[in-house]
Amino acid sequence: MSRFVQDLSKAMSQDGASQFQEVIRQELELSVKKELEKILTTAPSHEFEHTKKDLDGFRKLFHRFLQEKGPSVDWGKIQRPPEDSIQPYEKIKARGLPDNVSSVLNKLVVVKLNGGLGTSMGCKGPKSLIGVRNENTFLDLTVQQIEHLNKTYDTDVPLVLMNSFNTDEDTKKILQKYNHCRVKIYTFNQSRYPRINKESLLPVAKNVSYSGENTEAWYPPGHGDIYASFYNSGLLDTFIGEGKEYIFVSNIDNLGATVDLYILNHLMNPPNGKPCEFVMEVTNKTRADVKGGTLTQYEGKLRLVEIAQVPKAHVDEFKSVSKFKIFNTNNLWISLAAVKRLQEQNAIDMEIIVNPKTLDGGLNVIQLETAVGAAIKSFENSLGINVPRSRFLPVKTTSDLLLVMSNLYSLNAGSLTMSEKREFPTVPLVKLGSSFTKVQDYLRRFESIPDMLELDHLTVSGDVTFGKNVSLKGTVIIIANHGDRIDIPPGAVLENKIVSGNLRILDH
């Protein structure tokens, strides 16, 4: 009789279903452990230690995944955060700046999350290398911003890129172009975890390679991995040794996430004398943000609650703009000393995000991830700061790209600011159809970016192209039905117009 069957019969005779499940769990953990050990034997000697750390990290995550079942929050315990735990930005700004700005800046490290590819916008390679404004990429703008700070205040703020195995090689190739910039640039890699078969829960990978048949067998486990991989890289200790105190973490595709001197001053000179270990920038929800994670009070601490954690019966309540008015921008300010302490105590607690995927061959897999902001509850004296919407300017689609390329924004030292010529501070709602999804197609359809200073809403669907010097105002809806094509002529001014049908402009 196999050991598994013996265990099973023993379990059944003892405590029924729960005991049975526990045995199954233990067997699964043992099977996964054996599979991971097999994979580790295929690692080349120079990658062995690094791979072992990754696989050990995955085993811990997998163990937690097997323990947790159902929504990870008890809805009855969720409360609105107390007034003083989320401060308005105006109050932080009113404290002004210190006499010596460079002294606080020299305590800062800027970390950009650079693990993502540009696939959702039809681009190969790292998303950070997509051109967003005047030929400048996300990475160019980031370097320009920090160089401007270092030159203006005679400081040494370094830039750190958290790459993934998907982006590391291409990013490193491009970094040499910044050799003469006044910014020290460091990189470290996110962990690389194995995807698991949805049915068997065993790793899909058979060896450490991530090419050939193994291309889809591995994944970067979400930005919550920053704490462990930053610590393991040795950079955390290096920066603490240099006297750095805080990291400012943000997504590289959020063009609003610039270093804010008022927030930094608040951290370095806390008004109540109690150092704040974690600041999350939040901003007011609009209808477009209803799925964003929100800050709540939970068991006496600030806690980030994501839509995936909410019991189904309460999802509509979670999306309510009146009850939960703010959402997480993923601009975070975190104490380096606190990260070191919590990492060494194994005390950083983040909910697991179970992300189902289907591989090209049709195999259903899951990947286990964590989110950087979810760790807020592990830090002491955490704070939310309700910042202006201008600090949240993510470019996820070509619709977002159209906004940041337009005359709605002006570019100065790598930072985008809303044009003073726009009469209202809100950003227009832009929805470009599937013909515009890929950057290449999008660029082909605009001879030049339209004037959008007075635009409120733009919807474009179907085969549509724009000539030079087009001006869009109010609400503009352009719909070319299947088989039709619409060419908006050069110099056209469309104000509160619906354009449909067929409009071809041919060269004479």
From Swiss-Prot:
Residues 502-503 are annotated as: Critical for end-to-end subunit interaction. It comes from the Eukaryota. GO terms for biological process: glycogen biosynthetic process; glycogen metabolic process; UDP-alpha-D-glucose metabolic process. Its main location: cytoplasm. Keywords: Acetylation, Cytoplasm, Magnesium, Metal-binding, Nucleotidyltransferase, Phosphoprotein, Transferase. It is found in: Cytoplasm. The modification Phosphothreonine is found at residue 426. The modification N6-acetyllysine is found at residue 438. The keyword Cytoplasm applies. UTP binds at residues 113-116, 127, 190, 222, 253, 396. UTP--glucose-1-phosphate uridylyltransferase catalyzing the conversion of glucose-1-phosphate into UDP-glucose, a crucial precursor for the production of glycogen. Homooctamer. This is UTP--glucose-1-phosphate uridylyltransferase. It comes from Bos taurus (Bovine). The gene is UGP2.
